[in-house]
């Protein structure tokens, strides 16, 4: 017994046995103790973060607060994101042939609408997703999207007889003059906005499908190169209706030129799948031939943003089935963002049915990433002077975070001061479950376990808290305007004023004494 006590005393002197259980050969769990903090379910609350959930589509206010008839429902949490589309006609009304060759971009183009929108959004802590269009696909809109001086490179298609539609003015997509001029527009936009962190997303621009009108592979390559060269530091997305455009944009050589893989921007949530028919239908030649582009777009859903817009409810369709499909597709196709407009109840003058609202709300809350973190009880240990504990990171959302978020741990003393910052090894970008169920109403949680090691050397006796945070690191090189966000909001309680979440306590006794019995 005396020998045992001597061995224990020696261990204390070395500082290696803060909480050993009698030094009888049984390892101690160590001084770390897990703190329980269950995740907040998507059915209870939305967790707002950048590039996820409901966004202000085409600058329309969020629902339900954007509709006075929906005051019975609580306002949706503010979004970090809004989208805008603007016509080429508005951006470049002046024929460049009438200007000096060395005229600055501000004389060649009218950027005021984009500049004003960026400024207003930044004042609300928001960023912009931008699309430029040369053809407006609304069959009832007689507006012309190309500048007047570009009319010779277009074709007018009258509306069918006895129809309420308007004449459509569509660019000749393979016209060299059109391609060259639109490429110069993209280059100017890139010079002005690619280094602006207020611009989060740029949608592939320069082509829109009209009836059975086609575009050549050579023209596609030219447009893809123009978009990629203009915005190498901005997240690109593409409406995937044209498989050859998708093939080019998802190619490895394009991905290497960009800050991140190209994402998907899909129309018609609630009616059509976020994946186009050519990538899913058994009648598609791409599916039948097992074309590589089919697998490429399916895999891309898990690694890049999927931004959706709701679709108008078809005549005679069931609203319940519409919202159910929207929810199921959000989960199945890893949707990141859902629009604030274009669904049936958006502008309704009567209150939304509570059951339909629940489906709509669940679709928005499930969209995007939804991380939580907690230490696993009973996993703590100590070896020498290093205490350890297992930490579980779980994503309860339909998609992974795709931007620059850096998880880490901080050891905080009783005064609230951070005394240690410890690295995390979890990769949040890969933390998403690949579930293809067509009718799931919640994403399958995906969990990754990290081990935190705390070196006790040099720590003064006292009470400490081990806290987790996910810090914003999404920046553009040499940015003209910088956007800084606080740490990511996690789906759990306990966030402190610095955006940290407590996961464990660490107690170092004042005297480091070891109690023995017998």
Question: Could you say what each language-model-derived stretch is?
Answer:
Residues 1-12:
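Bacterial N-terminal signal peptides that target proteins for export
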Residues 20-22:
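C-terminal motif of bacterial Sec signal peptides marking the signal peptidase cleavage site
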Residues 24-26:
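Bacterial signal peptide processing site
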Residues 198-211, 224-248:
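Aromatic-lined carbohydrate-recognition surfaces of secreted/lumenal glycan-active proteins
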């Amino acid at each position: 017994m005396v020998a045992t006590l001597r061995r224990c005393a020696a261990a204390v002197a070395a500082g290696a046995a803060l909480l050993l259980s009698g030094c009888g050969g049984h390892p101690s769990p160590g001084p770390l103790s897990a703190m329980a903090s269950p995740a907040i379910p998507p059915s209870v609350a939305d967790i707002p973060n950048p590039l996820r959930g409901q966004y202000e589509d085409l600058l329309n206010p969020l629902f339900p607060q954007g509709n006075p008839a929906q005051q019975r429902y609580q306002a949706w949490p503010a979004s970090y994101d809004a989208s805008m589309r603007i016509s080429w006609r508005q951006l470049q009304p002046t024929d460049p042939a009438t200007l000096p060759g060395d005229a600055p971009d501000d004389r060649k183009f009218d950027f005021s609408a984009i500049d004003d929108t960026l400024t207003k959004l930044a004042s609300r802590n928001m960023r912009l997703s931008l699309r430029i269009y040369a053809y407006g696909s609304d069959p009832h809109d007689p507006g012309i999207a190309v500048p007047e001086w570009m009319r010779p490179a277009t074709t007018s298609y009258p509306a069918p007889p006895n129809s309420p539609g308007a004449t459509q003015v569509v660019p000749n997509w393979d016209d060299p003059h059109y391609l060259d001029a639109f490429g110069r527009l993209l280059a100017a936009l890139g010079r002005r906005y690619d280094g602006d962190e207020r611009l989060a997303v740029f949608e592939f621009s320069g082509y829109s499908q009209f009836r059975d009108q086609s575009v050549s592979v050579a023209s596609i390559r030219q447009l893809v190169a123009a978009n990629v060269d203009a915005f190498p530091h901005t997240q690109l997305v593409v409406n995937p209706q044209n498989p050859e455009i998708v093939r080019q944009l998802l190619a490895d050589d394009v991905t290497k030129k960009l800050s991140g893989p190209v994402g998907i921007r899909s129309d018609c949530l609630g009616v059509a799948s976020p994946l186009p028919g050519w990538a899913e239908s058994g009648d598609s030649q791409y599916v039948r031939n097992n074309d590589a582009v089919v697998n490429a777009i399916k895999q891309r859903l898990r690694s890049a943003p999927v931004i959706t817009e709701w679709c108008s409810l078809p005549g005679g369709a069931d609203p319940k089935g519409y919202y159910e499909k929207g929810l199921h597709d959000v989960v199945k196709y890893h949707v990141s963002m859902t629009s604030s407009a274009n669904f049936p109840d958006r502008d309704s003058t009567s209150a939304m049915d509570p059951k339909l609202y629940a489906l709509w709300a669940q679709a928005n809350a499930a969209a995007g990433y939804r991380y939580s973190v907690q230490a696993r009880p009973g996993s703590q240990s100590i070896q020498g002077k290093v205490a350890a504990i297992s930490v579980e990171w779980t994503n309860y959302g339909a998609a992974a975070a795709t931007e620059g978020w850096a998880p880490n741990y901080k050891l905080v003393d009783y005064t609230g001061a951070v005394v240690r910052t410890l690295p995390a090894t979890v990769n949040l970008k890969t933390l998403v479950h690949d579930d293809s169920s067509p009718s799931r109403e919640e994403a399958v949680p995906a969990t990754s376990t990290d081990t935190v090691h705390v070196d006790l050397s040099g720590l003064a006796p006292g009470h400490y808290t081990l806290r987790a945070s996910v810090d914003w690191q999404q920046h553009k090189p040499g940015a003209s305007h910088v956007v800084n966000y606080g740490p990511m909001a996690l789906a759990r309680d306990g966030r402190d004023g610095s955006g940290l979440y407590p996961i464990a306590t660490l107690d170092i006794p004042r005297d480091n004494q070891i109690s023995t019995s017998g």
